[in-house]
A protein has these predicted regions:
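Single conserved hydrophobic/aromatic residue that forms the stacking wall/gate
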Residues: 1-6
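Active-site loops and adjacent core secondary-structure elements that bind or stabilize anionic groups
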Residues: 9
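Transmembrane-helix boundary motif in ABC transporter permease subunits
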Residues: 19-55
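Membrane-embedded alpha-helices of multi-pass transport/permease systems
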Residues: 26-30, 85, 92-106, 110-113, ...
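Generic hydrophobic transmembrane alpha-helix motif, especially the helices
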Residues: 58-86, 160
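Short helix-to-coil transition segments within interhelical loops
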Residues: 61, 106-126, 130-136
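Glycine-rich helix-loop "coupling/hinge" segments at transmembrane-helix boundaries
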Residues: 77, 151-168
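Transmembrane alpha-helices
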Residues: 122-158
């Protein structure tokens, strides 16, 4: 009986982790591309500012606090699943870390690769999609694996959602 209950807990944590990783990778790639575009050619100033604020706030606050804010403030008046709230909170949290991982991967690619894309007649988007991102992805794959492991460990705190005694 106890092992069956633990199996359900493990399945739930794994489910939260998988969906949070998917959300985190989507957010992370978007934020990383905005930040890298700004770093390379100074474009997207307003979006870059919003992304910097997002990164600073999310990376600067504890995950537990983010989970509590998401559940007790953002989704307080809506009747949603606690798993959905956990996926949203951990996905947004993971997105900040994935963004910096991917941005560092993009910035690690030699400037000559950008110039090679330009010499082939590619615009910036084509250069990023066809030349830079495949190389950056190879470079950041180990760090993304580490982020998934960290996220799997962090999802254990999702059990605190709904425990009112801790917030009194």
């Amino acid at each position: 009986r106890v092992s069956r209950g633990l199996g359900d807990v493990y399945k739930r944590q794994l489910l939260i982790t998988i969906f949070a990783v998917l959300i985190g990778v989507a957010i992370g790639f978007l934020v990383a591309i905005i930040r890298a575009s700004h770093d390379k050619n100074g474009s997207l100033k307003i979006l870059n500012f919003i992304c910097r604020v997002y990164l600073t706030v999310i990376r600067g606050t504890p995950t537990m606090i983010q989970l509590m804010i998401t559940y007790y403030i953002i989704f307080a008046s809506v009747n949603v699943s606690k798993i959905f709230v956990a996926v949203c909170a951990f996905g947004i949290n993971s997105g900040a870390y994935v963004a910096e991982i991917v941005r560092s991967g993009i910035m690690s690619i030699d400037q000559g690769q950008f110039e090679a894309g330009r010499s082939l007649g590619f615009n910036y988007v084509q250069t990023m999609r066809l030349i830079i991102l495949p190389q950056a992805f190879k470079n950041v794959l180990p760090a993304l694996g580490n982020e998934m492991i960290v996220l799997l460990k962090e999802t254990s705190i999702s059990g605190y959602v709904g425990t009112m005694d801790l917030t009194k």
